[in-house]
Amino acid sequence: MKELTCFKAYDIRGQLGSELDNEIAYRIGRSYGQFLKSENDADKTVVVGGDVRLTSEALKQALANGLMDAGINVIDIGVTGTEEIYFATFYLGVDGGIEVTASHNPMDYNGMKLVREGSKPISGDTGLREIQALAEKNEFMDVEVKGNYKKVSLLPEYVDHLISYITPAKIKPMKLVINSGNGAAGHVIDELEKRFIELSIPLEIIKVHHEEDGNFPNGIPNPLLPECRADTANAVKEHKADMGIAFDGDFDRCFLFDENGDFIEGYYIVGLLAEAFLQKEQGAKIIHDPRLSWNTIDVVTKSGGVPVMSKTGHAFIKERMRKEDAIYGGEMSAHHYFRDFGYCDSGMIPWLLITELLSLAPDISLSKLISAKRFLFPCSGEINFKVKQAKLIMEQVYLHYYENSIHFSAIDGISLEFEGWRFNLRDSNTEPLLRLNVESKQNIALMNDKVEELTKLIKKLDI
């Protein structure tokens, strides 16, 4: 029985040929179908979609064949971003959904993201290990009645849902640069543009790298990397736009640029979105991760909301949101989660909400909004250290700082707070890395000093 190394902690990702091919995709379909059928033998339906990668369509069809051979009905919604699968799964009330995507991974990779009913995530401890075991064993139960297959477009319904997050009459005239990175976002932007015209929403869109093209002629879209930001930034400056928006390949993350073309750290976007929601629903709960938190806590508290800290990672955030009935959850990594979107992440909802937030304060630019937050709570951004013994170093760092700290949390790694500054240090689930985030209160020099101090200590301990 050969191990399938494409199964990761939270999803499926692998190099084409050696780790993932059509035959393995078929087995994953059979396995997921058998996994669903093991709960009860009622009719089951799964939604499938795929991004623009050149191999996604063939993998999706193999996956669909596996599902149907397991007795599962398949609804194929075509070329999609991951969030379109999330939407289709909860909107149609079906039993699960699978998106074929490798997001921002290299060209020779592909993968899958799986959810079950209500778009609840399937990851290591919620079914993915069982599906992996079935796929590796490759011995499937006989099925008397195969599932059926149909193609459906839900784009109009999905765009209706996106528009529901804003009040069209409140939107002021604005010029937006949108860089789809030749990924799956293009068709959604086109449909949104039509809807803006129909509803007299005065948003002008300048499109960059718009055509969906699995060859990715302008490089793999991953705006988290500084080298992937120039085209968006330059277009914002050239067209004198009010905001720039850039997506990764399956557009589950969006990255924002102010009117000067400057990239905005995801941390500060969490605060903006929290404020936008608390203007709509006073007293709501907002979930945030512990890596950087002071700005979010400050905004939420001042806006009359309740900040709730959760461990980093989509499965943890979604679970905590459901438990708390939180309206919104945000991570500094540009993942934003919404209660009314099945507690799932969306890359489209954030920028729509921020256009409304800017419209409600028409004399304040995006750069002014963000610079005020950067001044109050300057942050380092995430700094990665490749180390030999991550957990041992974390323990030593904790012992070094704990005595002088005023607050400690182990929700995710170690978070220690002091007068005027704090840090979070956590190890990666998948790589031999330590990830450091430092922030301060109105003191950039202190923040930089502490980054240097912690960097020296971590390197000294890595022996």
UniProtKB/Swiss-Prot annotation:
Cofactor(s) needed for function: Mg(2+)
Keyword annotations: Cell membrane, Isomerase, Lipopolysaccharide biosynthesis, Magnesium, Membrane, Metal-binding, Phosphoprotein
GO molecular function: magnesium ion binding; phosphomannomutase activity
Biological processes per GO annotation: GDP-mannose biosynthetic process; O antigen biosynthetic process
Gene Ontology cellular component list: plasma membrane
Predominant place of localization: membrane
Cofactor comment text: Binds 1 Mg(2+) ion per subunit.
Chain's role: Involved in GDP-mannose biosynthesis which serves as the activated sugar nucleotide precursor for mannose residues in cell surface polysaccharides.
Family per similarity comment: Belongs to the phosphohexose mutase family.
Name of the protein in its database record: Phosphomannomutase
Name of the encoding gene: rfbB
